[in-house]
Amino acid sequence: VIESIEAFAVQALCVADELGFPEDKVNPNGGAIARGHPVGATGAILTTKCLHELQRINGKYGLVTMCIGGGQGIAAIYEARQDL
């Protein structure tokens, strides 16, 4: 599952295409353009969406990308544990 920030939609689409992300794995339940979220809530919202989708599909890894202002960005990779 890949939850990618869409603050700049064209950039997000180009990066996903360049990195070869499968379309069905990127923002599977709609991204920021489709659903929206308040400024400052990106990390919490995208991480929660990613973790819920991993649970729903019994997935193993999730990638979350976020913009953090000033032209900077951050990413986090999560691994769902099946042994809990």
Residue ranges and their predicted role:
Residues 1-84:
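Claisen-condensing/thiolase-fold acyl-transfer catalytic domains that form or cleave C-C bonds
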